[in-house]
Amino acid sequence: APIQHAFADGVYIRQMDMKEGSAVVGAIHNHLHAWFLLAGHVTVATEETTEDYVAPCYVVSTPGIKRVILANEDSIFVNIHKNPTNTRDISKLEKEIVSLNYKEYEEYINKNK
C-alpha cells in the first residue's frame, strides 16, 4: 500500500491508502499512538483479538502489539506518531517508532527505560 508522509510540530503523520482486499502486516509500534480510519472498512487482527472498524473512527493503539490489517473496501488509514526531534528522515523515525519483531521491541524497551 502506498505511504504518504506529513509533519507538524512534534508530530509525524503516516497515511496508507489500501485497496479493497489488500492486507498489511504491521510492524510492532514502540509507543502509545493514535490511528484514524478516514475512509473505508478494515479488519484489524492481533494475537488476541479481531476487530472491524468502519470510517470515520479512531483508536488509541497500545504499544508492543503486532497487527494485520485487511481492507474490506478501499480505505485510508492514518497513524499519528510523536516526533520530538522534528526530523523528516523516515528511516530515523521508523527506528524510533517501530520494531520489526518482539526481540527488537524488548531491546528497545529495555534501552529506553
Predicted segment positions?
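Conserved short histidine dyad/triad with adjacent acidic residue
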Residues: 12-30
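Glycine- and acidic-residue-biased ligand/ion/polar-headgroup-sensing regions
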Residues: 29-48
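Ligand-binding loop in jelly-roll beta-barrel domains
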Residues: 62-91
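A beta-strand edge to alpha-helix "cap/lid" segment located at domain peripheries
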Residues: 43, 56-58, 95-97
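A generic "binding-loop/recognition-motif" signal
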Residues: 22, 30-31, 49, 64-65, ...
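Short hydrophobic/aromatic-rich beta-strand segments that constitute the beta-sheet cores
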Residues: 25, 44-46, 61, 79
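Short acidic-glycine-tyrosine-enriched beta hairpin
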Residues: 46-67
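A short, N-terminal "cap"/entry segment at the start of jelly-roll beta-barrel domains
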Residues: 1-15, 47, 93, 99-113
